[in-house]
Amino acid sequence: MKKYRLILAGLLFFTFTSAAAAGSGNYVVRAAENSPPPKIDGALEDPFWDGATVLDQFTQYEPVEGGPPSEKTIAYIGYDSRNLYIGVRAYDSNPSAIRACLTKRDEVMGDDEISIYLDTFNDKKRAFVFQVNPCGVQSDGVFTENRRRHRGGGFDRIDTSWDTFFLTNARIDNQGYTVEMQIPFKSLRFPNAQQQTWGLQVRRNIRRRNEDIYWAPRSRDINGFLVQAGTLKIDGPLEKGRNFEVMPVLTGIQAADEKFDPEPSLNLKYGITSNLTADLTVNPDFSQIEADMPQVDVNQRYPLYFPERRPFFLEGRDIFDTPIELIYTRSIVNPAFGTKLTGKTGKTSLGFLSAYDETPTYIDIPVEGDLESLQQNNRGLINIFRLKQDLYSESYIGFVLTDKETGRGWNNLTNNHNRVGGVDGHFKFDDVTRFSFQIVGSNSKVGETATGWVPAMNFDLSRQSRHWNLTASYSHLP
């Protein structure tokens, strides 16, 4: 299938000159080291906060860009060797109108909220996001600057399927509300260095007014979010994420007079360094994972898309993202075991995943005969390798290789295969102009039928400024 798209949209005028910078370079703070740690009760009354770094210069982004906020906001940042502590006093002239609900984790988007963005590698591409509403309900995720719309139709650049451990609490009072956060350094990935320089953005949303305010000002003259963030400096040493987690699981079933049928499983996670993590799973038990939302499967041209929720596949998932979505881990249905290595060293991000699947999805190509019978009772070995090299501000070049071998048993895994290799990249030319591309080839074989190498490609050139958006794209998909 070939798709050609050329979209021109605008309101007033367009200029091909580079837009002015947002001035976030002036928003640089150094976190204050302090002790003893505060009690995370949402009150902001501990002496710890008296010595914390203060952020009180906030600016509107919506509805009036650059305007003064309708309500005052003060943020406090401090740390010790184990945790980063963030407190916020959100003043409100009408506290009874604050929108806050007790809801499930990661579902605070309809409420007033405080959001913290931590770009721990300061590469302007990816940030950890921590959110809390005035009731203390948490939300966390990973923000990816150039995340594209996936097959399920989603487009949010915050992937909330990522969950980590952090503490929050909040209180509503007659002045507005206060929140406190404790973010363990073990929950983050960051460079192995004595001095840390992170990207930082603090956001407050006043829902009833549709008002967004930021510590580091945002401008529509700049195409990008993290490039407009401020800077947080932390003087180490910090407790690194060299942690070791072991999670053994035992489930079983016994019916009537039958013997008890045990089903053991094991999950291991090891933080090799503060920015490199290894995972191992053996016979994983996914029975406690939240069920998928129902979808209509009648008259569907393509297979249904379901989001990934299984913990083993979520660690470092953003590393495997590509403009054309090549890696869909839900196709690994019933892994007997799997290993994974993800992280970043210097300017290089890497990901490797290998899994042995006892019920793999079919390799879908035109064949002579019945496709299902040719692959029935197969087993599968899936290997995925991903490498991304940072070049300069918001730009990278990446490579991806995937290999899926299936057959009836470990010794016959070369009967069928699907292999994909490709290169992709993203380049920022100035504040408003970007270019991204991906070129891949795939080769499949089922029984005696082989496809040869099948190409696919995507090119996107965009120029987004305050009043005009220009996008030119070309896609060729088999």
Question: Language-model features: where?
Answer:
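Bacterial N-terminal signal peptides that target proteins for export
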Residues: 1-8
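Bacterial N-terminal signal peptides
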Residues: 9-17
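Structural preference for beta-rich elements and adjacent junctions enriched in aromatics
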Residues: 21-390, 395-399
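Outer-membrane beta-barrel translocator/channel fold
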Residues: 142-144, 288-309, 316, 321, ...
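Transmembrane beta-strand segments that form the barrel wall of outer-membrane beta-barrel proteins
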Residues: 246-256, 264-266, 350-358, 369, ...
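Alpha-helix capping and helix-loop boundary segments enriched in small/acidic/polar residues
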Residues: 255-259, 300, 329, 371-378, ...
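Transmembrane beta-barrel architecture of outer membranes
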Residues: 259-267, 277, 334-338, 378-386, ...
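Short strand-coil-strand connectors
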Residues: 344-346, 430, 464-466
